[in-house]
Amino acid sequence: MPNLLQKTRKITSILQRSVDSLETELPYNTMASRLADIIDCNACIINGGGSLLGYAMKYKTNTDRVEEFFETRQFPDAYVKAASRVYDTEANLSVENELTIFPVESKDIYPDGLTTIAPIYGGGMRLGTLIIWRNDNEFSDDDLVLVEISSTVVGIQLLNLQTENLEETIRKQTAVNMAINTLSYSEMKAVAAILSELDGNEGRLTASVIADRIGITRSVIVNALRKLESAGIIESRSLGMKGTYLKVINEGIFDKLKEF
């Protein structure tokens, strides 16, 4: 049997994975699955708003109603509010406790069900909650040590993810500002007209038609598109006689045009 140190290493090895390796929809499924295997329990991770970030169900303990929470990836507001008031790990909560993960209709089926809740912090902020549960058998002190470590690891990853997202937002904003600063008034007018033609973030357009409508030359539109493409704001592809296919890859340009 793996000892506590070996189990700890399995959990902390998650930190060696880059943020880019996290799944888009349920980024912490791997952490939840690893914790569930190591501690022999069910596990889930939610953010501060109750959105599901990852889960692992080793054992069937829930009803269709509760399974729906996992399918919709959103926990009930009442439960989320109650969990947010837990500031330190609450271990081995019975099925009678308001924080039990076991549904009311399952209390008779799993009378010995136990839930443990650990808050997730990062940078001094509450970022979410880690929840684990069993049909029976208390969580030992070793189990709880692993829970504390897991919540810390997830907190670090959540903080890193927030930092990377912020850096990406700043990078995109900077790229848009630099691109806008290279455009003349006529080119800005052309860009505004072009993007208003798109169906969402992409679509087909004909430069000559737009040029005639707003009273500028076709070359102004071509120059504006080249500048945006070189700045990584858009992607374009010639469709020959059908015009040009355009796709916006930096949506910050839309916000900037609102100021125009």
Swiss-Prot record:
PANTHER family documented for this protein: GLOBAL TRANSCRIPTIONAL REGULATOR CODY, GTP-SENSING TRANSCRIPTIONAL PLEIOTROPIC REPRESSOR CODY
UniProt GO cellular component terms: cytoplasm
NCBIfam families named among the record's database cross-references: codY_Gpos (TIGR02787), PRK04158.1 (NF003170)
Primary subcellular site in the record, as a coarse category: cytoplasm
The protein's name: Global transcriptional regulator CodY
Highest taxon of source: Bacteria
Gene Ontology molecular-function annotations: DNA binding; DNA-binding transcription factor activity; GTP binding
Annotated family: Belongs to the CodY family.
